[in-house]
Swiss-Prot record:
Membrane topology: Multi-pass membrane protein
GO BP term, pick one: protein transport by the Tat complex
Gene Ontology, cellular component aspect: mitochondrial membrane; TAT protein transport complex
Region (Disordered): 258-280
Keyword Mitochondrion assigned: yes
Protein name per its UniProtKB record: Uncharacterized tatC-like protein ymf16
Alphabetical list of Pfam families matching this protein: TatC
Other facts: A stretch of 270 kb of the mitochondrial genome is duplicated within the centromere of chromosome 2 resulting in the duplication of the gene. The expression of the duplicated gene (At2g07716) is not demonstrated. It is also probably not RNA edited and therefore differs in all the positions known to be edited.
């Protein structure tokens, strides 16, 4: 009888999880399809938004197409990339809805903090990159190609597809860099790695920065050097912030232990929660 009860509970939990996965997958697919068609419908406006840093240069600036299918490929690529950025919050929310019901109250608070931190870093880095980094990069590249004499005339007329891909790569590098401090803080908070492990193994972090820069950046040595430097700098800043947070938490924990609040809290710990989702 006990075996039948355990088998029934297992089948019920498995059916519940599979049903929840099906619901979340349907929502993601619907959002993905609607977002892609919407981005393709407004693909010209999206391309203009990405091309705005180049179009604001002081001289006559315009793009060229050298192939018959280049314009269509640019529209499709821009729509797909913009769709991936716009649908990312929906995918994150559906994953959050799937995982959060099985957590305790303290775990929910902790995971919500990581979720908000990840989203804030993502949009902050994206905004700073598009509003400050990309215009300065194109301003530098434009005036590097300018000539100071009349004996040699060089006029920059970039291909629209190459320009969009390079701009998207810069934005993607910033998106990857934005999640580095979140990952470091998450590992330290969940005790997956200690702060001493990070500080004593900085050479491995440098290898990680080189590997990430080589994997996610275009095959250009200067782009990889800049990406490696940015990732290393962000990791060091995250370790510094985590060190400050750890010192504050140790002081708070010692104060709570002296007052006896931690022992009282451990005695009144809540019972385990069952997996049940009411999020839609």
């Amino acid at each position: 009888m006990n075996y039948l009860y355990i088998s029934y509970e297992f089948n019920f939990a498995l059916e519940t999880i599979l049903g929840e996965v099906r619901i979340r997958s349907v929502w993601i697919l619907i959002g993905l399809g609607l977002t892609w068609f919407t981005c393709y419908w407004f693909s010209e406006e999206l391309i203009f938004l990405l091309a705005l840093p180049f179009l604001t240069l002081p001289f006559d600036s315009y793009f060229v197409c050298t192939q018959l299918t280049e314009a269509f490929s640019t529209f499709v690529a821009t729509s797909s990339i913009a769709c991936s950025y716009f649908v990312f919050p929906l995918i994150s929310y559906q994953i959050w809805c799937f995982l959060i019901p099985s957590c305790y109250g303290e775990q929910r608070t902790k995971y919500n903090r990581f979720f908000y931190l990840s989203g804030s870093c993502f949009f902050l880095f994206l905004f700073l990159t598009f509003s400050w980094v990309v215009p300065n990069v194109w301003h530098f590249l434009y005036f590097v190609g300018a000539t100071s004499t009349n004996s040699l005339m060089i006029k920059l007329q970039p291909k629209i597809y190459d320009y969009i891909m390079l701009t998207v790569r810069i934005l993607f590098i910033s998106s990857v860099c934005s999640q580095v401090p979140v990952i470091v803080i998450c590992l330290l908070e969940l005790r997956g790695l200690s702060l001493e492990t990070f500080t004593n193994n900085r050479r491995f972090l440098m290898v990680f920065s080189l590997f990430t820069a080589a994997l996610f950046t275009p095959p250009d040595i200067w782009c990889q050097i800049v990406a490696c430097f940015l990732i290393s700098l962000i990791i060091e800043l995250a370790i510094f912030v985590a060190l400050i947070v750890q010192v504050r938490e140790e002081g708070w924990t010692s104060g709570m232990r002296e007052s006896g609040s931690i022992e009282k809290k451990n005695k009144s710990s809540p019972p385990p929660r069952t997996w049940q989702s009411n999020y839609q």
